[in-house]
A protein has these predicted regions:
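Short, ordered loop/turn segments at secondary-structure junctions
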Residues: 12, 39-41, 77, 86-87, ...
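Loop/turn-to-beta-strand initiation segments
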Residues: 33, 78-80, 111-117, 137
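Conserved catalytic-core segment of NTP-binding enzymes
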Residues: 115, 120-168
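P-loop/Walker-type NTP enzyme "switch/lid" segment
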Residues: 37-111
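Walker A/P-loop phosphate-binding motif and the immediately C-terminal alpha-helix
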Residues: 2-40
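Alpha-helical segments flanking ligand/cofactor-binding loops in enzyme cores
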Residues: 25, 107, 129-130
Length: 168
């Protein structure tokens, strides 16, 4: 069974992607079958930190050009990676149905990973909340700045009160 962990933040620039990439690589280097999904849809940049340029992105899956297995890139460190794509307008405006299709597709991956980490877009957007709600655990990343604390609190409050997300 796959353990899904969403890594989220109330605001950008707090190190969420760095933590997502490093935690994913750490698990992969411990021979744990690990998949990192960059779900900062349309504005993804985990691939830059990984030093790779994926041939396919989540957009190829959403538009039906590729299967979910085809959009997985395997890094030299044996980390499986799915890019959310950069500057792809289709991914910025996904419907609820399309987001749920993405989440459901992970049940169809040929070799299911032990861990799936989701680098969620910053803030309380519907897309971020959908990925957080589908996770077993959520990590909220923040810095010592007052705005980071306030935005993290707002994200947690919105997740719990507005989206009924009650995940440890």
């Amino acid at each position: 069974m796959t353990t899904t962990i969403a890594i989220a933040s109330g605001k950008g620039g707090v190190g969420k992607t760095t933590i997502s990439v490093n935690l994913s690589l750490s698990l992969a280097l411990q021979n744990k079958e690990t998949l990192l999904l960059d779900a900062d849809l349309g504005m993804a940049n985990s691939h830059i930190l990984l030093g790779i340029n994926p041939k396919f992105t989540l957009d190829d899956f959403v538009t039906g050009k590729s299967s979910i297995d085809d959009v997985i890139t395997i890094t030299k460190d044996k980390l499986k990676f799915i890019s959310g794509g950069s500057a792809i307008n289709n991914l910025l405006n996904l419907s609820n149905l399309e987001r749920h299709k993405i989440i459901q597709s992970f049940n169809n991956i040929k070799k299911r990973p032990e861990y799936m980490l989701i680098d969620v877009g910053a803030g309380a957007e519907a897309s971020s909340m959908t990925f957080m709600a589908s996770s077993d655990k959520i990590i909220i990343v923040l810095t010592g700045e007052p705005t980071s604390f306030i935005d993290a609190y707002s994200l947690i409050k919105a997740a719990f009160l507005d989206y009924k997300i009650n995940v440890p």
